Amino acid sequence: MTGDWISKITHSGLKSWIEEVIALVSPDDVRLCDGSEAEYQQLCQQMQDAGVMTPLNPELHPNCFLVRSSPSDVARAEQFTFICTKTQEEAGPTNNWRDPQEMRAELHALFRECMRGRTLYIVPFCMGPLNSPFSLIGVEITDSPYVVCSMKIMTRMGASVLAMLGSNGTFYKCLHSVGKPLAPGEKDVAWPCDPEHMRIVHFQDDSSVMSFGSGYGGNALLGKKCVALRLASYLGHQQGWLAEHMLIIGVTNPEGRKKYFAAAFPSACGKTNLAMLMPKLPGWKVECIGDDIAWIRPGNDGRLYAVNPEFGFFGVALGTSETTNPHALATCYADSLFTNVALTADGDVWWEGKTTTPPQGMIDWKGRTWVSGGEPAAHPNARFTAPLDHCPSLDPQWNNPQGVPLEAVIFGGRRTETIPLVYEALSWEHGVMMGAGMSSTTTAAIVGELGKLRHDPFAMLPFCGYNMAAYFEHWLSFATKGLQLPRIFGVNWFRKDEHGQFIWPGFSENLRVLEWIFRRTDGEDAIAHRTPVGYLPTAEGLNTSGLDLSEDALRALLTVDAQGWKAEVSNIRKYCSIFGADMPQRILEELSRIESELK
């Protein structure tokens, strides 16, 4: 076993943790990752030799690879995701709670000798710009070269992070294994995993993560959802900041004035499409800072500032096309990994919605010849992993260690009725109620839940690392700190008519909604009118010029459906009852206000 990693680590706490893990998991070899391009290429070559990775046609996708996972390891596994806090009360009713001591014992049994026959990789990573007051350092120990390569794209990773950590910095311990030890001479499978014993566990007492049995994105790239949301939200609650499941964009109007917005949507509701929106309206510009996670802190001037802690995109491929998101296709043109997409005869990738006609002679995501009219060629949760700086609409402030000031926070979901196209909260408290009441039709990003309506407060249901009622209270507390808070808005691109057709054209036309939000943050009063559920655009207030949208359709999008809203309020109140006495009274008061005003 190579011991040269020891000489490169000056942090005694990190050194002793690594030694502890090695003793527990018994790897054949140990490797400290430096994050270099040479290391990345060597690991990609190793995976090609093992039949795990397929290089794409370099003329179509330079330095890109396709990976196929096991069909039993294709999405975030919420039923195996646990939050361990001293008391169950601290984790709250929306999290799977386990006693930390019991869970540690269970995991130690699973991890014992689990890396036999494999290489243990030490992956130092930084969430957030290097040397930013926002940033957190983690070290992931993993036995998956796919994870190492993905972490190079998704995080700032390697020697520079180790240097920043120094000999006494704080770091988050992240231990990951695919859970498939190899006996001497045993041949490995292309995608090792152990679905029966899958565990993704967060220990809030020492800010550590242990993940076993899955090699898939959110379960295995522990910097992403585990550190940047579940651990960071807990930390933010203690320290007075927010870790949110939000995109961050810069919107510039034709006069050249720019504002930054953050927006929360549940998985697969168009976050990446909005983050990379290509405006059709002349003179407008939308630039991307991130498409998934925002860390938000009060700045010295009293405004809220946001950074994207990530370094890459882990985007849903399905439906991404030159029409829906040309910037996403440009982003993953080179230096990207594709997981569970189809492979075309000429060495390109394909997924449903990429083109109207599927190419002939494809290999599907399970490695079989694809048959037209049969199963989908790509898995519905197929992904591209692409570098942030490859995005053609990347905002110049993307790496600013201080973050960017937010003027609007937007909440959205996939709702076919009741919820208007856009509306503005009457107050911060009303806005927090809007976030707490979010619900959406579910998608393939979550195992076993396709097509149901589920509550997803702030789009944080799977990612909040502590009691959600305390999280709502934390959001409310920002109104008492004398801050210059962003305005809060709700949007819904997904209303349908009586024929089941989407009313709003969506995609690049969503800029028209951003334009209204932009003007509202400028204090334009004439473009909105007050209703019980918030400020809605007046008929003339929303720019619909050049849109094929009838007056009836516009009315449907911008009218308060009193009966629908009464049902909505009652539904939210019923959901909030799961939090019992912990539920903040201010949110319940907002629900009562809406109800009484609707009468």
From Swiss-Prot:
Residues at which substrate binds: R76, Y216, G217, G218, S267, N381, A382, R383
InterPro entries, alphabetized: PEP_carboxykin_GTP_CS, PEP_carboxykinase_C, PEP_carboxykinase_GTP, PEP_carboxykinase_GTP_C, PEP_carboxykinase_GTP_N, PEP_carboxykinase_N
Active site positions, chain numbering: C269
**Protein name stated in the entry:** Phosphoenolpyruvate carboxykinase [GTP]
Quaternary arrangement and interactors, per the entry? Answer: Monomer.
User: Under which EC number(s) is this enzyme classified?
Assistant: 4.1.1.32
Where does the UniProt entry say this protein principally localizes?
cytoplasm
List, alphabetically, the Pfam families matched.
Answer: PEPCK_GTP (PF00821), PEPCK_N (PF17297)
Q: Which GO terms describe its molecular function?
A: GTP binding; manganese ion binding; phosphoenolpyruvate carboxykinase (GTP) activity
User: What UniProt keywords apply to this chain's record, in alphabetical order?
Assistant: Cytoplasm, Decarboxylase, Gluconeogenesis, GTP-binding, Lyase, Manganese, Metal-binding, Nucleotide-binding
SUPFAM superfamilies reported in the protein's UniProt record = PEP carboxykinase N-terminal domain, PEP carboxykinase-like
Q: Would you kindly state one Gene Ontology biological process term found in this protein's UniProt entry?
A: glycerol biosynthetic process from pyruvate
Naturally occurring in which organism (per UniProt):
Chlamydia trachomatis serovar D (strain ATCC VR-885 / DSM 19411 / UW-3/Cx)
Q: Give the record's cofactor note, including how many are bound.
A: Binds 1 Mn(2+) ion per subunit.
* Lineage of the species this protein comes from: Bacteria, Pseudomonadati, Chlamydiota, Chlamydiia, Chlamydiales
